[in-house]
Amino acid sequence: MKNAPEKVLQFGEGNFLRAFVDYWFDLANEKADWNGKCVLVQPIAPGLAKMINEQEGLYTLYLRGSENGKKVDDKRVISSVSRCLNPYEEEGFKQMMDVAASDDLEIIVSNTTEAGIVYDPACKLEDVPASSFPGKLTQVLYHRYKAGKKGIIMLACELIDNNGKELLKCVNQYLSLIHISEPTR
């Protein structure tokens, strides 16, 4: 499974996404032959990319609790992560944009905390990278659009009401700066 296609671009490399979302992708690989990997992107300059890459994306998940009325106390090595990018370094930003234009990309996942989905008028789309998460997402989506690639599924996991609608509102505000109108549905 080491060379599986990178189907997921994930903004956020914290415990929640790695223990929940990446776990489910790991199970999909094992039980449903999904055959996919996740590329993580650290959402802020101080992040975990170096540590995750030193471990080749592998980490152990401890599952404790109950399932179907039975006690669970399991360990599982998660292997669904291929690498983690630091977009605050020139090469990491380039790699993020390469993944954005990939034919393999199907899903973008995010958890940049409840403070992450905010429109920042000081954020510039020509910055490398844009300073806000919605700005980075706009860069990725616009790059994908210009490359003529198909649409993707967006899973916003931030803990705010209407997280997807709020994120869409921010992205549309950034698109208006480059004179791209909102998509029609």
What are these regions (language model features)?
Residues G36-E106, T112-A115:
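Glycine-rich nucleotide/cofactor/substrate-binding loop typically near the N-terminus or early
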Residues K94-L177:
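Active-site periphery "cap/insert" segments of enzyme catalytic domains
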Residues V21-A28, Y88-D98, Q139-L141:
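Short alpha-helical segments and helix-capping/turn motifs at coil-helix boundaries
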Residues S176-T184:
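Residue-level detector of conserved catalytic or cofactor/ligand-binding positions
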Residues L27-E30, G57-Y62, E126-A130, Q173-S176:
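Short, low-complexity, polar/charged sequence segments that are solvent-exposed and flexible
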Residues M1-K50, I117-D120, D127-A130:
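Internal mixed beta-strand/loop scaffold within catalytic domains of large alpha/beta enzymes
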Residues D33-G36, Y62-E67, S132-K136, S181:
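Glycine-rich loops and low-complexity Gly/Arg-rich segments
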